[in-house]
Design a protein with these regions (language model features):
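Positively charged n-region of N-terminal signal peptides that target proteins for export
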Residues: 1-4
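Short, low-complexity N-terminal intrinsically disordered segments enriched in polar/charged residues
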Residues: 6, 11-33
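Short solvent-exposed beta->alpha transition segments
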Residues: 25-26, 41-81
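Short helix-adjacent coil turns
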Residues: 31, 35-42
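Surface-exposed, charged secondary-structure patches
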Residues: 64-107
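A short, surface-exposed interaction/processing loop segment used at functional sites
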Residues: 109-118
Length: 118
């Protein structure tokens, strides 16, 4: 009985993690495409409502345009690790490689995003 319960917990956990990974994959791909196109509206729509209120569309515009002019296109995102609900990626731009930290809300919207030097 214990093993059946343990197996059920493992299968359920694996299913939840797979759904979580799929949400992150979808969001990172959309962010990369919209960042490179400098589609501010599309990037803004990826943000959770709380982030939209906090950053405003003008703030997102400054963030995207500033990063794009300084770093170039975002060529590749490579998963590094997940810790405390935040996924870390190596973000390879034309001019620099940075670490991108990303946290999604339960709806798959960006709750936190930041770039920093490795």
């Amino acid at each position: 009985m214990k093993y059946t319960l343990l197996l059920l917990v493992c299968i359920t956990t694996q299913s939840i993690l797979a759904q979580d990974a799929a949400a992150y994959e979808t969001t990172t791909k959309a962010f990369q495409e919209n960042f490179n196109a400098q589609d501010i509206d599309a990037v803004f729509d990826l943000y959770a409502p709380e982030m939209q209120e906090e950053m405003t569309k003008e703030g997102v515009t400054r963030f995207i345009k500033g990063c794009h002019s300084q770093f170039g296109n975002l060529n590749n995102l490579t998963f590094i690790e997940s810790a405390e609900g935040i996924n870390s990626y190596t973000a390879a731009f034309d001019n620099i490689s940075l670490v991108m930290e990303l946290k999604l809300n339960p709806d798959g919207k960006i709750a936190t995003i930041q770039f920093q030097e490795p």
